[in-house]
Design a protein with these regions (language model features):
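The serine-hydrolase catalytic nucleophile loop
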Residues: 58-71, 84, 93
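Catalytic histidine-centered segment of alpha/beta-hydrolase-like enzymes
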Residues: 223-233
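An N-terminal hydrophobic leader/cap segment in hydrolases
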Residues: 1-32
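Conserved alpha/beta-hydrolase
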Residues: 73-91
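Short beta-strand element of the alpha/beta-hydrolase
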Residues: 49-57
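Short beta-strand/loop motif that positions the catalytic acidic residue
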Residues: 183-185, 190-192, 196
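Primarily recognizes the serine-hydrolase "nucleophile elbow" in alpha/beta-hydrolase
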Residues: 109-113, 119-163
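Alpha/beta-hydrolase active-site loop
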Residues: 94-114, 179
Length: 250
C-alpha cells in the first residue's frame, strides 16, 4: 500500500508533445538497448567539446524544454536529452531505479557510442532530474553537475508539498540529493528561483551547505520553479557558460 501511494505522489509521467523540439535542429534517436531499455532521446550536436546531458523534471518530457535547448544552442553546447521509462515516447513504467538506469544508459551512450570523454560531460538536472543527476555523479565520472530547482530529499519535499498527509514520513527515504552532494567530487552549480513555491529556496541553501568541494549557488531573482533560465537572462547564461567551459572545456 505504501509503495502504491509513494509512486502516485512521486511519478507523474507526461506524454504530451509541448512543441519544444520543433524549431531546433536535432536528431530524434532511441537509446538504452544495452541496458534493456527503449528510451526516446533528442540529440543536439554542436561544435563544443563539452556536452550537456539533460535530465528533465517530473510532469514533463523532452518536448517541454525549448528554453534550455535554445540556451545550450546559443552557448554552442552539444546536448543529449532523453525521456525516462514511461515518460514521453519512452517505453516502460516509471520507478526510482528505472530513472537511475536510464541516466546510466544515456551516459554510456555518450561515452561508449559517441566516444565522449566523461570529463567533458556536464550533467544538468531540473527538479526531480537533479536527483537523477546527483545519483549518477555520486558513482560515475563526469566533468561537472548543474542542478536547477532541486529538493533535498523525498521526505523533505513530501512533507512540504503534502503537509496534510503525515503518511509521507513513513515512506522510504529516496532521491537523496543532500547525501549525494556530500560525496560528489565533481564541481557543482546549484540554480534556484527566488520565488519557487514548489521547492523552497531554503532547500537550495541546505544543498549548498552540505555539498562537497567546488560549488556555486545562484538564486535567480523573480524566478519560480520552471523559469530560471528565462528570468536569469544573460547574467545567468554567462555563469552557466563560464562554469561548463571551466570544468568541461569549450
Amino acid at each position: 500500500m505504501l509503495s502504491i501511494i509513494e509512486k502516485s505522489l512521486t511519478f507523474k509521467p507526461n506524454q504530451i508533445d509541448h512543441g519544444g523540439l520543433r524549431t531546433l535542429e536535432h536528431e530524434r534517436i532511441r537509446i538504452g538497448a544495452h541496458f534493456g531499455l527503449d528510451l526516446d532521446a533528442a540529440w543536439f550536436p554542436r561544435k563544443s567539446k563539452a556536452i550537456i546531458l539533460f535530465l528533465h523534471g517530473n510532469r514533463h518530457n523532452i518536448t517541454r524544454f525549448y528554453d534550455h535547448y535554445a540556451l545550450f544552442e546559443k552557448l554552442g553546447l552539444s546536448c543529449l536529452a532523453f525521456d525516462y521509462p514511461g515518460y514521453g515516447e519512452s517505453a516502460g513504467t516509471p520507478s526510482e531505479q528505472g530513472l537511475y538506469a536510464s541516466a546510466r544508459a544515456a551516459r554510456s551512450f555518450l561515452v561508449e557510442q559517441l566516444n565522449y570523454d566523461p570529463m567533458r560531460i556536464a550533467l544538468y538536472g531540473c527538479s526531480l532530474g537533479g536527483s537523477i543527476a546527483t545519483e549518477l555523479a555520486s558513482h560515475s565520472e563526469v566533468g561537472c553537475v548543474i542542478t536547477e530547482s532541486t529538493f533535498t530529499n523525498s521526505h523533505d519535499i513530501g512533507q512540504f508539498l503534502y503537509p496534510y498527509l503525515p503518511i509521507t514520513r513513513f515512506l522510504p527515504l529516496r532521491f537523496r540529493n543532500d547525501a549525494n552532494l556530500a560525496i560528489i567530487k565533481a564541481p557543482k552549480l546549484l540554480i534556484h528561483g527566488e520565488l519557487d513555491e514548489r521547492v523552497p529556496v531554503s532547500m537550495a541553501n541546505k544543498l549548498h551547505d552540505v555539498a562537497r568541494g567546488p560549488k556555486e549557488l545562484i538564486i535567480v531573482p523573480g524566478a519560480d520553479h520552471i523559469n530560471c533560465v528565462v528570468k536569469g537572462g544573460q547574467e545567468l547564461h554567462q555563469r552557466i557558460a563560464d562554469f561548463t567551459t571551466l570544468h568541461c572545456g569549450n
